């Protein structure tokens, strides 16, 4: 009887030892045996959001232009957001790699997984996705309290800005991202969402 009681207690105690688990932007479940201690962030926005999640001190690798906050500039770089070195990533022995789906290309995902690396795909499409990512990063790195606080602050700031703009007539906006050839973004891009938040209207929002 005592043995059975011990077994039952151990069974119900097991979930408390389970590592963090979240669903990433690609709909994949990412589970870790324990909170990540060595993280590689493969895009500047990923690095910034990891710092917002309280996981900046766990970053061991970033990419070029990861310059916010200033502490990010002291972290070793493995390349750029569009061209990074797989060998450099592996050499850092990360227990979590945060991949930018469209920037790095999803083609890199199977290769990283074949090497036994845990990968979270980050692809924020809207402003709400930013705070969701921060919370995910906090869960994965064991800094959920910090992440939730900063994500909630971000959401509150967005709501305040939206209320300030109110029902004012929108201003027509053209956002140039490159000059040769001339390039802009459509309404699905995060930039367009920010334009709308600030009271603008992307004149190319309806383009494919």
Predicted regions and their residues:
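Sec-dependent signal peptide recognition
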Residues: 1-8
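Extracytoplasmic substrate-binding proteins
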Residues: 19-22, 28-29, 96, 100, ...
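Short hydrophobic/charged patches on amphipathic alpha-helices used for structural packing
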Residues: 86-87, 109, 192
């Amino acid at each position: 009887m005592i043995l059975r009681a011990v077994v039952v207690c151990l069974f119900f105690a097991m979930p408390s030892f389970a590592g963090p688990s979240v669903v990433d932007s690609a709909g994949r479940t990412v589970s870790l045996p324990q909170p990540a201690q060595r993280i590689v962030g493969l895009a500047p926005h990923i690095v910034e959001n990891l710092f917002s999640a309280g996981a900046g001190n766990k970053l061991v690798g970033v990419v070029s232009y990861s310059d916010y906050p200033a502490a990010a500039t002291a972290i070793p770089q493995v390349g750029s957001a569009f061209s990074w070195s797989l060998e450099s990533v592996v050499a850092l022995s990360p227990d979590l790699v945060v991949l930018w789906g469209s920037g790095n290309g999803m083609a890199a995902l199977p290769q990283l997984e074949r090497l036994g690396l845990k990968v979270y795909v980050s692809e924020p499409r809207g402003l709400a996705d930013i705070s969701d990512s921060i919370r995910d990063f906090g869960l994965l790195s064991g800094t959920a309290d910090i992440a939730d606080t900063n994500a909630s602050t971000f959401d509150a700031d967005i709501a305040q800005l939206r209320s300030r703009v109110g029902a004012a007539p929108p201003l027509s906006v053209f956002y140039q991202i490159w000059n040769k050839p001339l390039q802009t973004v459509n309404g699905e891009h995060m930039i367009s969402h920010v334009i709308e938040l600030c009271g603008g209207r992307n004149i190319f929002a309806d383009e494919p």
